[in-house]
């Protein structure tokens, strides 16, 4: 009974520490950021899983580092650099995926590496102390400022409006692009629009878990949801809810045990995915 009692006591202590931490603005910002990002991941991540666009999403995430390098080198907000650069690279990768379907993996891999290389070189060439470079790679949810929460909320609204306007069209190109073509839908333009939405979501998620682990938070909740629901709106709702749970649990564990928040969130999500596979079988 003693190990169980110690475990219960440790859990109570962790909960008390989290309740106390909620008094501070940085923790409140972290919770709000988790909710906003989880919503975006559930909505866009579902289409990533349905369309099997995980590799493109990973390429966009890593290529965004080139935009961060541009921001440092030319002395403007690296986040805006990541937005613009990832959007351009996403459209390029989407065009490659549509035009060169047989060789797209290789070409996307080259663009992935190119973006990272540009970012690393520009940061190396930048003079002065670069304090927060690591936060873009590994995430720093506890340092998200309040003004960026408004940016995240705006991006969430943009994604919701986009899906409201083009939901049926996105479904058509996801499940039967040939039928979509016969219905005179602009399949290529719709595909590039979806890729652009992925780029915007990547930059949002980057602030929580970092570029290295962005793709996990985008795909794991949706992949779990896809095993148990077949309706896309339900998949989006479940994926968003799971993302919120993973972020909340990961944030609590990282704060209690002084661990990296981004890595802890992804660890929680990965364990949940493995458990879901076991139950599925």
Swiss-Prot record:
Any one of the GO CC terms: plasma membrane
Subcellular location field: Cell membrane
Pfam families, per database record: ABC-3
Alphabetical list of Gene3D superfamilies matching this protein: ABC transporter involved in vitamin B12 uptake, BtuC
Biological processes annotated in GO: response to zinc ion; transmembrane transport
Mode of membrane association: Multi-pass membrane protein
InterPro entries attached to this UniProt entry: ABC_BtuC-like, ABC_TroCD
Record-annotated membrane-spanning stretches: 30-50, 54-74, 76-96, 106-126, 153-173, 198-218, 235-255, 259-279
SUPFAM superfamilies membership: ABC transporter involved in vitamin B12 uptake, BtuC
Disulfide bonds: none
Superkingdom of this protein's organism: Bacteria
Keyword annotations of the record: Cell membrane, Membrane, Transmembrane, Transmembrane helix, Transport
Similarity comment: family membership: Belongs to the ABC-3 integral membrane protein family.
Protein name (Swiss-Prot/TrEMBL): Uncharacterized membrane protein slr2045
Organism of origin: Synechocystis sp. (strain ATCC 27184 / PCC 6803 / Kazusa)
């Amino acid at each position: 009974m003693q190990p169980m009692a110690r475990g219960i006591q440790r859990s109570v202590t962790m909960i008390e520490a989290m309740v106390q931490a909620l008094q501070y603005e940085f923790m409140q910002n972290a919770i709000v950021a988790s909710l906003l990002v989880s919503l975006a991941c559930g909505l866009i991540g579902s289409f990533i899983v349905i369309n099997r666009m995980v590799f493109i999403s990973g390429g966009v995430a890593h290529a965004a580092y080139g935009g961060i390098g541009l921001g440092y080198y030319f002395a403007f907000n690296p986040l805006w650099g990541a937005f613009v650069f990832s959007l351009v690279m996403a459209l390029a990768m989407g065009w490659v995926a549509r035009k060169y379907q047989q060789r797209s993996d290789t070409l996307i891999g080259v663009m992935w590496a190119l973006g990272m290389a540009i970012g690393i070189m520009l940061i190396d060439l930048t003079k002065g102390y670069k304090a927060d470079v690591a936060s873009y790679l590994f995430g720093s949810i506890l340092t998200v400022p309040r003004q960026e929460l408004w940016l995240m909320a705006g991006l969430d609204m943009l994604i919701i409006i986009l899906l409201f306007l083009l939901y049926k069209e996105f479904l058509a190109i996801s499940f039967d692009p040939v039928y979509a073509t016969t219905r005179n839908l602009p399949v290529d333009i719709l595909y590039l629009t979806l890729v652009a939405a992925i780029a915007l979501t990547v930059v949002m998620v980057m602030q929580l878990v970092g570029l290295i682990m962005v793709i996990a938070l985008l795909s794991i909740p949706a992949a779990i949801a896809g095993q148990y629901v077949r309706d896309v709106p339900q998949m989006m709702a479940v994926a968003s809810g799971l993302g919120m749970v993973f972020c909340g649990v990961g944030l609590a564990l990282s704060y209690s045990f002084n661990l990296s928040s981004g890595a802890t969130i992804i660890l929680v999500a990965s364990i949940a995915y493995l458990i879901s596979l076991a139950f599925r079988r």
